[in-house]
Design a protein with these regions (language model features):
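Intrinsically disordered, low-complexity and often Lys/Arg-enriched segments
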Residues: 1-7, 77-80
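Long, charge-rich, low-complexity alpha-helical segments
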Residues: 29-80
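A short, structured beta-strand/loop element
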Residues: 5-45
């Protein structure tokens, strides 16, 4: 798995951390935890309270990146 260039500041993959799962940089919190929480209706504020090692900036950067990917995939104008 390769981390997108835009997210290298926020995410990391290290075989020594969480068996090489994609995690928030400097933490042991897998990205999948954020996605699972959002799918369950848990908001960003609650997520960063529950996982204080993940900064709001890290989580928001990933969410924003995902939104851009979706908009691009469905052909929505990215220039806002």
């Amino acid at each position: 798995m390769t981390i997108p260039e835009d997210l290298k500041e926020y995410l990391s993959i290290d075989p020594e951390v969480m068996h090489g799962k994609l995690c928030f940089k400097g933490t042991r919190v897998p990205l999948a935890v954020l996605i699972d929480n959002l799918e369950e209706g848990i908001g960003l504020d609650e997520f960063v309270e529950e996982y204080p090692s993940v900064t709001r900036e890290q989580a928001q950067a990933v969410i924003s990146w995902e939104q851009r990917q979706i908009r691009q995939a469905v052909g929505l104008d990215l220039a806002r």
